[in-house]
């Protein structure tokens, strides 16, 4: 595997290989001496055209724990602001010896385009409304860690399925690993084509009774301005994960959220930090999974 552009094109075996590698990477994070020399001498660049805290930091920490050097390009002060094209920026980084580039961009397909014109490995950290593969992989790893399997589980995804790159990558990954997918949200935020992959259930109170795992998507607040939801209060009433809704769920329900959370909108704080929640674990699992991605793409070696 040369690039990580999305889960739609990955095979089941490629997904499972990354999840398998993430387990020993998690062990590294938990031990006293966290750094290993696996990617010593390698250089990784991060190029974020959209604001990011946790994803950018997670990718950079993952690289450093594998002993790679990291070059973080500040888009706000770089040649990009002077009119340099994306292609020129990436080829310049490549000419400096950078071997992998982590990119986030607001336009669909940018990582795929760059992979066609660069010798460096391109890692998609989120492109428009298309995909967010590393987030889906860490979600899959977290489910596997808590449930021991993915195949046969009923996984409920709640929220704005239409615009969410997290939802799309999760749906591709879950379907390839044999999960039964249920989606729930306002009709205005559920695309027709999702019915090819998932059962659509507009009544969250009914959907949550069936679920083994619930992944609550962050609601982009501009959806209200666009008229796709009536109000945040109404969204919370019908699709917020509340303590009252949790009482209807299975005893061993697993709660996930990609973060950052809008508390009191898509999820209540007491649910986010309840004993069924693995939201904090997702953060540490994200570092482990991104270490596994680097190892897969950059020919990691054991020393």
From Swiss-Prot:
**By its UniProt entry, which PROSITE patterns does this protein fall under?**
CARBAMOYLTRANSFERASE
Q: What name does this protein carry?
A: Aspartate carbamoyltransferase catalytic subunit
* Family membership noted in the UniProt record: Belongs to the aspartate/ornithine carbamoyltransferase superfamily. ATCase family.
A UniProt-annotated Pfam family? OTCace
**UniProt binding sites for carbamoyl phosphate:** 54-55, 104, 132, 135, 259-260
What Gene Ontology cellular component terms go with this record?
cytosol
**Gene name in the database record:** pyrB
Q: How does it assemble?
A: Heterododecamer (2C3:3R2) of six catalytic PyrB chains organized as two trimers (C3), and six regulatory PyrI chains organized as three dimers (R2).
Positions contributing to L-aspartate binding: 82, 165, 218
Q: Which GO terms describe its biological process?
A: 'de novo' pyrimidine nucleobase biosynthetic process; 'de novo' UMP biosynthetic process; amino acid metabolic process
Which is an annotated GO molecular function term of this record?
aspartate carbamoyltransferase activity
Q: To which pathway does this protein belong?
A: Pyrimidine metabolism; UMP biosynthesis via de novo pathway; (S)-dihydroorotate from bicarbonate: step 2/3
Q: What keywords appear on the UniProt entry?
A: Pyrimidine biosynthesis, Transferase
Asked whether the keyword DNA repair is assigned, the reply is no
The role this protein plays is: Catalyzes the condensation of carbamoyl phosphate and aspartate to form carbamoyl aspartate and inorganic phosphate, the committed step in the de novo pyrimidine nucleotide biosynthesis pathway.
């Amino acid at each position: 595997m040369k690039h990580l552009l999305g889960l739609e094109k990955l095979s089941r075996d490629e997904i499972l290989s990354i999840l398998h590698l993430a387990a020993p990477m998690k062990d590294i994070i938990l031990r006293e001496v966290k750094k290993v020399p696996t990617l010593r001498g390698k250089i990784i660049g991060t190029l974020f055209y959209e604001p990011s805290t946790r994803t950018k930091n997670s990718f950079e920490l993952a690289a450093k724990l594998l002993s790679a050097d990291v070059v973080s390009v500040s888009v706000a002060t770089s040649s990009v602001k002077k009119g340099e094209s994306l292609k020129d920026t990436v080829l310049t980084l490549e000419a400096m010896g950078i071997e992998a580039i982590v990119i986030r961009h607001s336009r669909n397909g940018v990582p795929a385009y760059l992979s066609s014109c660069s010798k460096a490995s391109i890692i998609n950290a989120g492109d428009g409304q298309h995909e967010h593969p590393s987030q889906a992989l860490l979600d899959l790893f977290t489910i596997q860690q808590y449930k021991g399997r993915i195949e046969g589980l009923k996984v409920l995804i709640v929220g704005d399925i239409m615009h969410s790159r997290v939802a799309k990558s999760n749906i591709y990954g879950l379907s390839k690993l044999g999960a039964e997918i249920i989606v729930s949200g306002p009709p205005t935020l559920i695309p027709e084509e999702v019915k090819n992959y998932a059962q659509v259930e507009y009544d969250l109170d009914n959907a949550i009774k069936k679920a083994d795992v619930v992944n609550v998507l962050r609601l982009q607040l501009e959806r209200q301005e666009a008229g796709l939801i009536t109000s945040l209060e109404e969204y919370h009433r019908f699709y917020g994960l509340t303590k009252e809704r949790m009482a209807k769920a299975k005893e061993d329900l697993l709660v996930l959220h990609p973060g950052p959370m809008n508390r009191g909108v898509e999820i209540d704080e007491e649910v986010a930090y309840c004993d069924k929640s693995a939201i904090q674990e997702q953060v540490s699992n994200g570092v482990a999974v991104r270490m596994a991605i680097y190892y897969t793409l950059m020919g990691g070696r054991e020393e």
